[in-house]
Amino acid sequence: EVFIDGGDAYSEFETNALGTTYQVFFIWRDAYKKGGVFDIPEFDIFKNNALTFGGDFDRSDQYFWVGTHPRGLRWAFLNWQFPGLLHASHVDGKINDNSVPDKGWTVELAFPWKGMKYLAAGRSLPPKDGDIWRIFFGRFEKLMPGGVELNPHPAWVLSRHAVYDTHIPECFPFIQMSNQTVGR
């Protein structure tokens, strides 16, 4: 999973070893205003069937429609696709066959800067050397020991943020952009 915070909005991208993807664009409801940056056809809540979203673990009857995040609810655009995104998966093993030891799988992602237009929040695109963005990188695995699904699903993340809900942008790690070549 990759979540990119844009202040008043954030995007979610998920993929699996088969290359199946899931993408959503979230806009905080307090930021969705007539004449605002998100008041465009791409984010028309009626034409695009936007859903109300409270958070990953706010699905109990008590919080489902109101959420528990201090900022409130988000509009979730499930039909949104990150502009120009490229992705590929490679499996070194046999998917869903526990009789064959796997070596692993890899994924390669390319998020074009121009596709981050609504996530830039006034920041330069591409970012300048030293700019800081909040981006969550995580991996979740559905395990079924003895045929029973383990919940919550085990997770590996770039930076631990002490809550299981990945929809808290203020907990995403700080990523500093750099013009330096890696390894130098």
Label for each model-derived stretch:
Residues 1-184:
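Structural preference for beta-rich elements and adjacent junctions enriched in aromatics
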